[in-house]
Amino acid sequence: MLVLGLETSCDETGVALYDSERGLLADALFSQIDLHRVYGGVVPELASRDHVKRMLPLIRQVLAEAGREPGQVDAVAYTAGPGLVGALLVGASCAQALALAWGVPAVGVHHMEGHLLAPMLEAQPPAFPFVALLVSGGHTQLVRVDGIGRYELLGESVDDAAGEAFDKTAKLMGLRYPGGPEIARLAEQGTPGRFVFPRPMTDRPGLDFSFSGLKTFTLNTWQQCRDAGDDSEQTRCDIALAFQQAVVETLTIKCRRALKQTGLKSLVIAGGVSANQSLRQSLETMLAELKGQVFYARPRFCTDNGAMIAYAGCQRLLAGQHDGPAIAVQPRWSMETLPAI
């Protein structure tokens, strides 16, 4: 089965072609970072308009790179949620129009299920069951995964997601959008131990997260340094390191608890924050101690992309699932409501 995948949940337009027998044939991505950077964050209306502009050229590009014609596509998968409603509607409308024109089925994919399954595109994919840490700008969740659609939520953020905390903290410190890579870049030059930030919600049982207080603590520390006349680049680097260490250690502690609670030895990390090298190293060290294994997608498939949507959609299409002709999206959507296959 040859599936065209479309991703438009936020500020990246992703398109890919996935073959159920040959794997990923081609993928293309257009990022809107430069468009939104001047505003310090994503402007939903601008995101939607840019998706409209980029979608068809990217589809033509992917078909050409794969050496395929539209008539060879067997189905279209698209991100149906969660995400920005206008951006989602662009992808859904395009997918349903193409499916109607080509006489093929369409299927809406849960954005976070796409992230969760992205490591399946690698040469050594994880085997079920496993624990998944989903860390992105909108989500921080620990999920027990027994199969596609068989998800048990173990814990989640009660306020800011980890990626959101990175972006907001960076903005408060005067760094460029998106903030995660900027903080990681500065942290490489930071002085270990100069600042020590709290590890939120690690002093109590449970697997939930909270990063809003850490964001405020970081801002207060930065403001105190500035008030004392120390707003040097080195101080900025030291604070970035302390913040990143706090987030990484908090996530690692919670993942260790989740593995112990479930008795599993395999951990998948997915979502934009999973590209953070400090987080990867920390989790790899922890899994080595537990004699387990950690899995993640290659960096370009950690952020939003069409390949993960094409793959996830292909699995559901092969199981006989597809949508009707109605154009419908779900800006808020729990993965636990997805049917198992």
Swiss-Prot record:
It is found in: Cytoplasm. One of its GO terms (cellular component) is cytoplasm. It catalyses: L-threonylcarbamoyladenylate + adenosine(37) in tRNA = N(6)-L-threonylcarbamoyladenosine(37) in tRNA + AMP + H(+). Fe cation binds at residues 111, 115, 304. Binds 1 Fe(2+) ion per subunit. GO terms for molecular function: iron ion binding; N(6)-L-threonylcarbamoyladenine synthase activity. Its EC number is 2.3.1.234. Disulfide bonds: none annotated. It comes from the Bacteria. One of its GO terms (biological process) is tRNA threonylcarbamoyladenosine modification. Transmembrane segments: none annotated. Keywords: Acyltransferase, Cytoplasm, Iron, Metal-binding, Transferase, tRNA processing. The keyword Cytoplasm applies. The keyword Nuclease does not apply. InterPro entries: ATPase_NBD (IPR043129), Gcp-like_dom (IPR000905), KAE1/TsaD (IPR017861), TsaD (IPR022450). Its cofactor is Fe(2+). Its main location: cytoplasm. Substrate binds at residues 134-138, 167, 180, 276. It is an enzyme of class 2 (transferase). Pfam families: TsaD. Belongs to the KAE1 / TsaD family. Required for the formation of a threonylcarbamoyl group on adenosine at position 37 (t(6)A37) in tRNAs that read codons beginning with adenine. Is involved in the transfer of the threonylcarbamoyl moiety of threonylcarbamoyl-AMP (TC-AMP) to the N6 group of A37, together with TsaE and TsaB. TsaD likely plays a direct catalytic role in this reaction. NCBIfam families: gcp_kae1, T6A_TsaD_YgjD. This is tRNA N6-adenosine threonylcarbamoyltransferase. It comes from Stutzerimonas stutzeri (strain A1501) (Pseudomonas stutzeri). The gene is tsaD.
